[in-house]
């Protein structure tokens, strides 16, 4: 919600000054956004057109939430209670793309078997943000990835019954349960 509000409030000012608004600078946000850009540049170079669909996958993590990320997520949840209409913005993968409405996007909100990788994947807690950022980048680059571009981002849990059990457990967990306070974390060791 707040990123959408800030784009509406400051987007024109940023454009006029030549500035760029960068909201998400976490361990995942920039690598996924730049990873899609790098991949699409390579696909265009090799095939003359962009890939119409890209799937981002998290293989593993050994970091922790920053207090700022946790506070942003908590504030978003609190804002939803006061303004239920924000849910439409949060659920829209194109909410940061200046009014663009793209194609229906792949499901990323429940565990599933990724048949190409032959592994179970679970919802990645930052995917709702990262997906919006990637679609915004596409829009800001005049839809270099295409108007029909689809993206989803999930967390690899592993193959077989153990992978399915892990995917089910991750999808039912609360990522904010042990979150640090704003201004705290991640620790030096985990960075």
Predicted regions and their residues:
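Rossmann-fold NAD(P)-binding glycine/threonine-rich loop
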Residues: 1-19
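C-terminal catalytic/substrate-binding lobe primarily of soluble NAD(P)-dependent oxidoreductases
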Residues: 15-18, 29-30, 41-191
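Active-site nucleophile and cofactor-binding loops and adjacent substrate-binding regions
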Residues: 23-29
């Amino acid at each position: 919600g707040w990123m959408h509000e800030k784009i509406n409030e400051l987007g024109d000012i940023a454009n006029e000054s030549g500035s760029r608004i960068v909201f998400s600078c976490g361990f995942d946000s920039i690598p996924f956004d730049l990873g899609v850009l790098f991949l699409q540049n390579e696909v265009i170079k090799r095939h003359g057109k962009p890939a119409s669909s890209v799937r981002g996958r998290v293989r593993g993590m050994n970091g922790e939430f920053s207090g700022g990320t946790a506070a942003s997520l908590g504030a978003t949840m609190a804002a939803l209670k006061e303004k239920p209409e924000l849910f439409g913005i949060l659920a829209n993968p194109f909410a940061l793309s200046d009014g663009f409405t793209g194609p229906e996007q792949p499901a990323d909100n429940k565990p599933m078997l990724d048949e190409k990788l032959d592994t179970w994947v679970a919802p990645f807690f930052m995917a709702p943000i990262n997906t919006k950022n990637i679609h915004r980048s596409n829009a800001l680059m005049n839809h270099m990835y295409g108007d029909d571009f689809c993206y989803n981002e999930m967390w690899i849990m592993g193959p077989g019954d153990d992978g399915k059990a892990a995917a089910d457990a991750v999808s039912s967990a609360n990522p904010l349960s042990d979150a640090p306070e704003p201004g705290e974390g991640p620790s030096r060791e985990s960075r």
